[in-house]
Amino acid sequence: MSYKQQYAQVLHDVIGDALSQEEIEQLIEQPKHEDHGDLAFPCFQLAKAFRKAPMMIATELAEKIDNPLFSNVQAAGPYVNVFLNREVVSREIIKRVLEEQQAYGSSELNGKTIVTDFSSPNIAKPFSMGHLRSTVIGNALNQISRKKGYEVVGINHLGDWGTQFGKLMVAYNMWGKEEDVRSEPIKELLKLYVRFHEEAEENPGLEDEGRAWFKKLEQGDEQATALWTWFREVSLVEFSRVYEMLGVSFDSLNGEAFYNDKMQHVIDLLEEKDLLVESEGAMVVDLEAEGMPPALIKKKDGATLYATRDLAAAVYRLETYGFEQAFYVVGGEQALHFKQLFAVLKKLGFENVDGMHHVPFGLIMKDGKKMSTRKGRIVLLEEVLQDAINVAKQNIAEKNPNLANAEQTAREVGVGAVIFHDLKNERMNNIEFDLEQMLKFEGETGPYVQYTNARANSLLRKGAYDGSAFNGSADDYSWGVVSMLNQFSAVIDRAFTRREPSIISRYVLDLAQSFNKYYGQVRVLEDDAEKQSRLALVKSVTIVLTEGLRLLGVGAPEEM
């Protein structure tokens, strides 16, 4: 039970039935200033029931509260502020962190599932910087959801279908070489795709050939299917290299093609409920009552659309996973598409639709412009990550030339810096990409948090930390750190509820700053009776910093 819950229980015992314990808990605040206590209860909602002014109620309640958990209880205007007993609370929190280790802050749920649709690059196209945000936000949400006790199904809804494959087949048959594609798949396939469009300007008949090849693919033609399968496989090999660098994995790679034979099922469901209406020759679902334009399901020529495929995917996932929630980590420009998707699913009578969420995000900017191309070419994510690793290598060589595991540490610091920089910003904000800035060891960066954690681990080694010697006491300077450790579980809850990984990023930055302040005030390694207790606090910080970074998908090297 959290201290907030315990305070709510104490208040409920005094107040009686005017408010439930849950209502009291929701009203309790955390004061912004330390001299206002650790928890504050506003009395406004009791005024009617007690027929008294909130200030008078606060004074009376403060006089009645007597509990060893609180060292001081004060009425401050209409608030009842309590100060936690620092010795008792410090002992409890540090003991809990040391006992629970990585499980500290976790929740337990029985078999509830969350499905996350994230990353979703297009096959045979470069894995550009444009895919970074969906990939790292989705991965962080998965880690946070697992921490909350959910079973998570991470889906990479690959863009592996469409007329572009017909064009690619024409281009490959005309100009491609197998050995070139095998050696540099994405580069060669992109080159062929670009050449197709250049040649098609002179020879428009190529477009018809492209359509014809895609039709062959749709009809299951052996040669077309073999080429499509190969393009998909070589692309995935290249993508998997980037995912490995980022430490991201998926439970399903079912992309657009997987739903080819599942769209009719959705169309049948829509017809059964009389939801399909004709509009200018096309088949649509009318969403006028929902204040939206109609959802286009079938074009005039009978061809299905992106929306039909997404409906088929949603229905398949609802029927297969029976999820409680689903997150679609996709850019904000798709907002209407998802509103329509959820509205159609509601009309079909699916119960879990309220748990389906579009999780949009802002753009990556470079010098105030959208970072999609560099000197007219696509900025490849793998190149950016490699650049970051190289800069991290240089920084480590300057700071610690004899570091034993320098290569692995540079990967964790370099890649971690890119991920952390993305996730320290609220996801709806555009982010400015500045490699030099994000790799600094000071300021609001991933390396700053990692370096703080490495420094804490160094103290444990130098001080010969012995976990069994913790006697539970904590000094006056440690309270800022202890109260930060206490917030970890609530921070995870907030990040999950808002689908906002930046809440975790801000927290690990604040915890790192709080620890560095403590380190500057206290001689941690002084050989006295309290040394092991101080080191127990340091150990608790390393556990929570490491776990907080893990939730973001960032490594925590023990030495830097």
Swiss-Prot record:
TM helices/strands, residue ranges: none
Alphabetized SMART domains for the sequence: Arg_tRNA_synt_N, DALR_1
Catalysed reaction, written as an equation: tRNA(Arg) + L-arginine + ATP = L-arginyl-tRNA(Arg) + AMP + diphosphate
Localization of this protein: Cytoplasm
EC nos: 6.1.1.19
Cellular component terms per the entry's GO annotation: cytoplasm
Biological process according to GO: arginyl-tRNA aminoacylation
Alphabetically ordered keywords of this record: Aminoacyl-tRNA synthetase, ATP-binding, Cytoplasm, Ligase, Nucleotide-binding, Protein biosynthesis
Keyword Methyltransferase: no
Chief place where the protein resides: cytoplasm
'HIGH' region, short sequence motif: residues: 121-131
GO molecular function: arginine-tRNA ligase activity; ATP binding
Highest taxon of the lineage: Bacteria
Gene3D superfamilies, per database record: Arginyl tRNA synthetase N-terminal domain (3.30.1360.70), HUPs (3.40.50.620), Isoleucyl-tRNA Synthetase, Domain 1 (1.10.730.10)
The protein's enzyme class: ligase
Subunit organization: Monomer.
Family per similarity comment: Belongs to the class-I aminoacyl-tRNA synthetase family.
UniProt cross-references to PANTHER family, sorted A to Z: ARGININE--TRNA LIGASE, CYTOPLASMIC, ARGINYL-TRNA SYNTHETASE
Protein name stated in the entry: Arginine--tRNA ligase
Native organism: Exiguobacterium sibiricum (strain DSM 17290 / CCUG 55495 / CIP 109462 / JCM 13490 / 255-15)
